[in-house]
């Protein structure tokens, strides 16, 4: 009996010590986690997100700090809201944060995540990105499409001149979607959407895909509520849009195969690479379709959204508009009415204006999320593998500690003597991201935007259509994968040529 009591006491002591050790370990780990707001059972911090997540996350960061830990349902989310913290994620530990989280939308719409933008990090992704950069996005290749950009921009200018002659307004938001869509369609498919039914259908499908990628399916974060995505039609829309896009691209690829391989557009180039087996790994036909989709997403949304915000800010800030017009119009005279891409190379104020719009209106205010592949310390905090990371570029680029007390103001002059570029070297300015996952299509987007703004501002004076704020365009945002204006930008052009 005495022996049994002794053994029981020893076992009880050992179990107690083990449980105490586990408790202390968990407590120590929790103490070393980033600050977190309180959360609700089941849904975590989802209730604290607004229709504009970049703004609500910024508000939370002002209270809990530039590195905070949220929970969307059962998923831990590390929110980064300062350049200093972003430095550790995107530079110091870039490889550990190089993966992408899996989501229902990406899996259903993006070939199971086998594309470049949303695909998981690994050898296959590195090979695919290399194919894109070396064959599609080199400076030489981007420059070779200047004639296409010029032709499509001239088409838009003709519409504006017609509106000017009749003193009528134009929906600039609509024009800014059409222009990059036509340019991208001609570069990628060899046809423009406004003149071809297949290209028009493809534009529609790309828009639907972007809208679905910008939605927030509850099942990704709270599996117990995944039935809601079925009831509200999200799952059905994913299936319908994905199949519709795949069928369209099958048709496009087949037409290119039947026409012969002349390496005239991106589809031809990719088919040539596939047939020559020259890329060092086996690319599937579906890979081609989704590389083209990546191009449409990157080539249309960034350019159209940026153009919309540039013209919004210029009309709202007539002094900036006048200064930019003076710079551009001094260039027009010796070169005729159309400004070419080589003419904008030395337009410092134009480049400063575009940079400032990227700062205050980044098309992707929340950089596409990353997934931590192994445990790591960030700013002294323990971050566990499997944590998703959201970098709030919108908050970083409005940080008064970096940009000064006028950080909320639109002020292009701050960039005139700046060495900032678009390649993510300075983590306080990351409109295209940084590190391994930086957007590879920077030059493609900038090439169209710069020459478009130069011609719009150089050839026309502008006046916004009267609205609730008089002739001042408002700054109300819509939200999706990219953040454009909620209401169309309607303005009156007045030709000065």
From Swiss-Prot:
Disruption phenotype: 90% decrease of all indole-3-carbonyl nitrile (ICN) derivatives and increased susceptibility to virulent Pseudomonas syringae. Its EC number is 1.14.-.-. InterPro entries: Cyt_P450, Cyt_P450_CS, Cyt_P450_E_grp-I, Cyt_P450_sf. It comes from the Eukaryota. GO terms for cellular component: membrane. Keywords: Heme, Iron, Membrane, Metal-binding, Monooxygenase, Oxidoreductase, Transmembrane, Transmembrane helix. Belongs to the cytochrome P450 family. This is Cytochrome P450 71A12. It comes from Arabidopsis thaliana (Mouse-ear cress).
């Amino acid at each position: 009996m005495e022996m049994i009591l002794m053994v029981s006491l020893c076992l009880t002591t050992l179990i107690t010590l083990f449980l105490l050790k586990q408790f202390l370990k968990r407590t120590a780990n929790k103490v070393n986690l980033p600050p977190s707001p309180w959360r609700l059972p089941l849904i975590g911090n989802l209730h604290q997100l607004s229709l504009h997540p970049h703004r609500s996350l910024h508000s939370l960061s002002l209270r809990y700090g530039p590195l905070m830990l949220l929970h969307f349902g059962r998923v831990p989310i590390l929110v980064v809201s300062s350049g200093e913290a972003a430095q550790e994620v995107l530079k110091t530990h870039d490889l550990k944060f190089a993966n992408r989280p899996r989501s229902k939308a990406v899996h259903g719409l993006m070939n199971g995540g086998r594309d470049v933008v949303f695909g998981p990090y690994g050898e296959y992704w590195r090979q695919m990105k290399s194919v894109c950069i070396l064959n599609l996005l080199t400076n030489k290749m981007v420059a070779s499409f200047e004639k296409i950009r010029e032709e499509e921009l001239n088409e838009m200018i003709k519409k504006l001149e017609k509106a000017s002659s009749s003193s009528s307004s134009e929906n600039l938001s609509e024009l800014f979607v059409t222009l990059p869509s036509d340019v991208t369609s001609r570069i990628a498919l060899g046809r423009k959407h406004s003149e071809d039914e297949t290209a028009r259908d493809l534009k529609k499908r790309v828009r639907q895909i972007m809208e679905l990628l910008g939605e927030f399916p509850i099942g990704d974060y709270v599996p117990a509520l995944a039935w809601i995505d079925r009831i509200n039609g999200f799952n059905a829309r994913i299936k319908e849009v994905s199949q519709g896009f795949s069928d369209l691209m099958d048709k496009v690829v087949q037409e290119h195969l039947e026409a012969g391989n002349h390496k005239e557009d991106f589809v031809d180039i990719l088919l040539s690479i596939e047939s020559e087996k020259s890329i060092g790994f086996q690319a599937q036909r579906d890979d081609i379709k989704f590389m083209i989709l990546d191009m449409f997403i990157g080539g249309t949304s960034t350019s159209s959204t940026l153009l919309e915000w540039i013209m919004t800010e210029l009309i709202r800030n007539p002094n900036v508009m006048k200064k930019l017009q003076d710079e551009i119009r001094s260039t027009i005279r010796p070169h005729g009415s159309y400004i070419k891409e080589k003419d904008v190379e030395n337009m410092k104020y134009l480049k400063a204006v575009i940079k400032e719009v990227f700062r205050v209106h980044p098309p992707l205010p929340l950089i596409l999320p990353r997934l931590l592949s192994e445990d790591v310390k960030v700013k002294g905090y323990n971050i566990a593998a499997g944590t998703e990371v959201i970098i709030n570029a919108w908050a970083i680029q409005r940080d008064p500690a970096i940009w000064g007390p006028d950080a909320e103001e639109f002020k292009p002059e701050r960039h005139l003597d700046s060495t900032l570029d678009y390649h993510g070297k300075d983590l306080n300015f990351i409109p295209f991201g940084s590190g391994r996952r930086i957007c590879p299509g920077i030059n493609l987007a900038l090439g169209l935007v710069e020459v478009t703004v130069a011609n719009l501002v150089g050839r026309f004076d502008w006046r916004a259509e009267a609205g609730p704020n008089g002739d001042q365009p408002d700054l109300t945002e819509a939200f999706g994968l990219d953040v454009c204006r909620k209401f169309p930008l309607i303005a009156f052009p007045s030709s000065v040529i």
